[in-house]
Amino acid sequence: MPVIISNKLSKEQEEKLVVVLKEHKTALGWTIADIKGISPSTCMHRILLEDNAKPSRQPQRRLNPPMMEVVKKEVLKLLQSGMIYPISDSQWVSPTQVVPKKGGITVVENHQGEFVPTRVQSGWRVCIDYRKLNSVTRIDHFPLPFIDQMLERLSGRSYYCFLDGYSGYFQIAIAPEDQEKTTFTCPFGTFAYRRMPFGLCNAPGTFQRCMVSIFSEYIEHFIEVFMDDFTVYGDNFDACLNHLSLVLKRCVETNLVLNSENCHFMVEQGIVLRSYCVVQGY
């Protein structure tokens, strides 16, 4: 089970951490096939339209050969994992586009000698242009947390675990009656989503509401949640490890899967929402 942990841990601390991770190994995912899906009874995405909404069927957009290969690979992956399915009679059809994909946050030194967080392009991302659908969708006003308050609660802790949801949106089901509204067209056919894709205007609110529901009694006590970025913390190793165990247990119970490659366990500093979170403050 290769995972990223602090290189400052003692042998005993490493062993304790490994025991906890092995005990909750189903909370960690390696491929999209590991996503089981959060129960619709816990959370499900709805697409509610304004009363005067008129369906829109848009044509596919032209893609150059390299981008067609990107789309083909993505469509096959999503079909095989059951995230999408072919559809031919939808009243709503949106076009596909390909945009640069940003990788994880890294730290680079600028011209002033300051270390700043940045993202580098790591490939291409297939997105659906849902602007017409979004323009007639009733807006969900579920609030996101204030970042400055989150950082205040996080600063000065001894240990952190930075956790990342695996393809977070894809873990939430779309209501069956709303799936056809997510239909997209590409050179390989028309497909609709069973799980919540990027690009829907209310997806962030649905996801945040779902995470708050899952971790409600833990938030602001030993975990901070901002979309699919979760930060577990503690004032000493054993406290942080116990908090991590509780969070992973909740993940297993709710089928929430974390991206094992992007999680950092029991570290003393890191980056939260592009801000340093260190022992001395932020």
What residue ranges belong to the model's regions?
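Retroelement reverse transcriptase polymerase core
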Residues: 1-282
